[in-house]
């Protein structure tokens, strides 16, 4: 206001009003004719708009659902895993074979591989797992086409499970479900062998679902193990308590840190344990001497030592044993694939008593985020209504302004259907932002109608016509400026860094288009109908 008082004097403003641009004059002329026609055929206009809204609402429920849109990170992260227990040499050879196949893809110029990771690494891996980073440069093919080519080539490696993703996407999946895949089917139970059998049955049941790729069951093999079971009666005869026995076995076989040594600025644990030569064979372990009331006796006197087989790993969640059947999504939305998985599992898998399945990964996060955003959007609508009511002091006028929300929803839904065909979390955030933006146009019209009727004493219908014409330019200018700012984001969704912004911009752009166009007809019609009593 201060700048306007200095820069816009009355004389120059009057000249500009007299010399209104021909585009604005033409638009007002066309809009005036269209608005008069709409006011004559109110029922037809309202009926068509309601029909559009119902179609958009039905279309919304047919759209696919996903947590986040696919990222374009410019690099593939590929996990090549075989059965635990494979030698480092065999795993390295398998990794080299994968590298050779990757280099046959034209878009990939270089690869980098890690086979296994150190035990103290924050993401420790056995030597049976190779992690390959393969940067790519897109040429004539899309990212999905290149990924499918990579997947097809690597599927020729026998005895290997392949997972293909991208660096950040892999980390997100790992944080969400503990597995580096989009979908994690978690099977909980007690018997690991039975769980592994049921897990393979689930894999076979869902193997042919379109769009489900990189399907695998968590690797489990039986490995030789040594069990040492105390003989309690003999321990009592020799005067050995159970805590003493447990500490002895831990120290002799596992070692115990008793102090620390500083050397050259570094700290090392001083560990007490038996020598490696003294525990090479089972017979060596049987002959280890244990203190027994002032004398020593062989360990085999007071314990049963047996060689058995057991699982290489036991994973738990909330104290329950679990195995994971994991998979990725390709060229299809996440929600529909998970729904089909649930249908096939429910129809073909009979779970033993005490066993149950949970679906995790991006699907679980998408459901939780959608519920949170739905609650947030309802709260925001309530706040918007209260603010409008506080300003206009009229529930009817506040309700008329909120009619812009379904008008905006129409464009947002249709533009999603024409572009990605999926509703992701960024798209939902776009809808919430759109609802706030869309109320602006209704406020401009209603506030001007009220001013004309109360201050200038203009009759109802004339106030609606004149107010709509007066506010045409401001509404179009604000909508156009917002749209022009959003177009670059909406059109460049494939560029790295724009993947999340693009769905939001697309939804807002489509909603602005329909809300701006329909706002100029629906708000005047509804305002006129709701104020008939005042006119009479």
Can you say where each PLM-predicted feature lies in the sequence?
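Hydrophobic, well-structured modules enriched for small/aliphatic residues and gly/pro motifs
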Residues: 1-12, 425, 435
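Transmembrane helices with small-residue packing motifs
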Residues: 10-12, 50-87, 141, 177-182, ...
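Short beta-alpha connecting loops at secondary-structure transitions
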Residues: 15-19, 83, 429-433
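Signature of alpha-helical transmembrane segments and their immediate interfacial
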Residues: 17-69, 109, 156, 160-161, ...
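Residue-level recognition of strand-loop junctions within catalytic nucleotide-signaling folds
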Residues: 83, 116-117, 137, 273-275, ...
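Short, conserved charged micro-motifs
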Residues: 87-90, 140-146, 194-197, 332-337
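Solvent-exposed, membrane-proximal periplasmic/extracellular interface segments of envelope transport
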Residues: 89-179, 233-255
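C-terminal transmembrane helical bundles of large multi-pass transporters
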Residues: 153-533
């Amino acid at each position: 206001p201060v700048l306007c008082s200095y820069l816009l004097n009355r004389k120059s403003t009057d000249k500009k009003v007299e010399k209104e641009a021909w585009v604005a004059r033409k638009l007002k002329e066309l809009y005036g004719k269209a608005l008069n026609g709409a006011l004559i055929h109110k029922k037809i206009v309202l009926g068509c708009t309601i029909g559009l809204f119902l179609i958009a609402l039905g279309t919304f429920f047919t759209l696919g659902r996903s947590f986040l849109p696919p990222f374009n990170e410019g690099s593939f992260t590929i996990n090549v895993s075989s059965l635990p227990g494979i030698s480092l040499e065999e795993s390295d050879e398998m990794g080299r074979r994968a590298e050779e196949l990757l280099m046959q893809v034209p878009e990939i110029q270089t690869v980098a591989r890690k086979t296994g990771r150190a035990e103290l690494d924050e993401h420790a891996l056995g030597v049976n797992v190779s992690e390959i980073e393969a940067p790519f440069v897109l040429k004539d093919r899309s990212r999905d086409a290149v990924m499918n080519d990579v997947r097809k080539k690597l599927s020729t490696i026998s005895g290997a499970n392949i997972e293909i993703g991208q660096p950040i996407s892999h980390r997100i999946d790992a944080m969400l479900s503990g597995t580096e895949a989009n979908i994690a089917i978690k099977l909980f139970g007690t018997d690991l062998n039975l769980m592994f059998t049921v897990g393979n049955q689930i894999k076979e049941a869902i193997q042919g679902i379109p769009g489900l790729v990189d399907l695998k069951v968590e690797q489990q093999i039986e490995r030789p193990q040594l069990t040492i079971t105390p003989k309690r009666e003999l321990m009592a005869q020799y005067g050995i308590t159970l805590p003493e026995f447990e500490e002895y076995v831990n120290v002799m076989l596992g070692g115990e840190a008793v102090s620390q040594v500083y050397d050259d600025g570094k700290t090392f644990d001083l560990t007490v344990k038996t020598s490696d030569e003294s525990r090479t064979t089972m017979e060596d372990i049987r002959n280890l001497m244990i203190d027994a009331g002032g004398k020593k006796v062989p360990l085999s006197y007071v314990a049963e030592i047996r060689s058995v087989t057991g699982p290489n790993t036991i994973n738990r969640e909330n104290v329950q044993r679990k195995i994971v059947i994991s998979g990725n999504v390709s060229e299809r939305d996440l929600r529909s694939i998970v729904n089909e998985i649930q249908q096939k599992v429910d129809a073909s898998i009979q779970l033993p008593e005490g066993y149950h399945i949970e679906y995790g990964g991006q699907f679980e996060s998408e459901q939780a985020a959608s519920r949170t955003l739905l609650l947030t959007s309802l709260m925001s609508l309530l706040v918007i209504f209260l603010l409008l009511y506080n300003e206009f002091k009229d529930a009817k006028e506040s309700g008329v302004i909120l009619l812009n929300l379904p008008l905006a929803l129409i464009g947002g839904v249709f533009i999603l259907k024409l572009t990605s065909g999926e509703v992701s979390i960024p798209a939902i955030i776009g809808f919430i932002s759109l609802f706030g933006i869309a109320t602006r146009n209704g406020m401009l019209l209603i506030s001007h109608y009220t001013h004309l009727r109360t201050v200038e004493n203009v009759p109802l219908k004339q106030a609606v016509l004149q107010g709509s014409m007066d506010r045409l330019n401001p509404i179009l200018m604000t909508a156009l400026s917002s749209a022009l700012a959003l177009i670059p984001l909406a059109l460049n969704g494939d560029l790295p860094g724009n993947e999340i912004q693009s769905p939001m911009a697309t939804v807002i752009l489509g909603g602005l288009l329909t809300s701006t166009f329909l706002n100029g007809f629906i708000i005047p019609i509804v305002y006129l109908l709701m104020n008939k009593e005042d006119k009479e």
